[in-house]
């Protein structure tokens, strides 16, 4: 169970574990060997301040915009504490996360400490859906302004398309008609 307190309450979907590969019965994170093969890319992305969890903030910085944010307090009263429960759009990585520049994580937001974290604050865009739409429009209109962001985002997108969301052939066949 999580208790969520927001400065300006709005609908918010929180996620803990995010799987990359579907085995047919469960989602799993990318294996260590695959991540190790991508060390240079992930280190470069993280060094540039590009994390999937903070893409909106990175795009906003790339366009030299100041986004409006709010603080969300998460109290983990009985859920698994191995991961930080966070929305898809963070303005900054929480201090309680074990994710660092040299981390080989791409989609996870592991909690720091042996037993994880039970309470933490997140900074999120005030209106993430509106912010995302505005940023996409601005990136289309003035791509030269955000070259560094677009380079990082393109590299990450290629990595995701190559590695993430792999489905077994049976699942792919079932989804094909959709």
Label each region the model flagged:
Residues 1-178:
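Helix-boundary/low-complexity linker signature
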């Amino acid at each position: 169970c999580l208790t969520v307190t927001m400065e300006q309450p709005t609908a918010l979907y929180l996620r803990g574990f995010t799987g990359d590969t579907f085995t047919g019965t469960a989602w799993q994170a990318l294996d260590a060997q695959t991540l190790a093969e991508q060390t240079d890319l992930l280190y470069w992305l993280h060094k540039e301040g590009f994390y999937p969890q903070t893409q909106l903030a990175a795009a906003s910085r790339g366009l030299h915009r100041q986004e409006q944010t709010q603080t969300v307090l998460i109290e983990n009263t009985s859920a698994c504490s191995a991961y930080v429960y966070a929305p898809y759009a963070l303005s900054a990585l929480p201090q309680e996360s074990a994710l660092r520049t040299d981390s080989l994580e791409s989609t996870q937001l592991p909690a720091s400490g042996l037993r994880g974290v039970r309470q933490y604050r997140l900074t999120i865009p005030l209106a993430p859906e509106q912010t995302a739409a505005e940023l996409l429009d601005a990136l289309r209109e003035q791509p030269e302004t955000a070259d560094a962001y677009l380079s990082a985002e393109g590299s990450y997108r290629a990595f995701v398309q190559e590695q993430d969301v792999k489905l077994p052939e049976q699942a792919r066949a079932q989804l094909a008609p959709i």
